[in-house]
């Protein structure tokens, strides 16, 4: 039986190259290589890598980098911002990213956001296009 972890996060140490947006109460790093080693140790064949929003916000470049280094082990999900006027282009570009399997809509203003919000509509329309 193939075992897939449905949600993992990996991240580098906080550096000038890839600075964190916030400093959570987590280990200093859990790199892609460390994640693969941990998966191998417990018999996990693959995982859905969700880019760590709390650290990298909407930049999924580390998730893409890890997926490229470990093809076949990770599928990747990128957070998207409904308040970004270019979010439809972001989604369209993401759909062409090798290993991309989804987006994560980050609702920073959920209490005030209406279901017919234009940003949500842009995301859903872009995601539905083939």
Regions found by a protein language model. Give the residues of each.
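An N-terminally biased module of ancient metal coordination in phosphate/nucleic-acid-related enzymes
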Residues: 1-58
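Active-site gating/metal-coordination segments in enzymes
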Residues: 54-130
């Amino acid at each position: 039986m193939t075992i897939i972890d449905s949600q993992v996060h990996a991240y580098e140490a906080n550096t000038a190259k890839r600075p964190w947006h916030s400093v959570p109460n987590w280990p200093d790093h859990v790199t892609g290589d460390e994640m693969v080693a941990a998966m191998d140790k417990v018999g996990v064949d693959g995982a859905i890598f969700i880019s760590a929003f709390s650290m990298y916000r909407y930049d999924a470049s580390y998730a893409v980098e890890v997926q490229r280094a470990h093809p076949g082990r990770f599928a990747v999900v990128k957070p998207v911002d409904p308040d970004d006027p270019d979010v439809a282009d972001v989604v369209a570009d993401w759909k062409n990213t090798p290993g991309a399997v989804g987006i994560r809509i980050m609702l920073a203003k959920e209490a005030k956001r209406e279901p017919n919000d234009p940003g949500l509509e842009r995301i859903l329309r872009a995601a539905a296009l083939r």
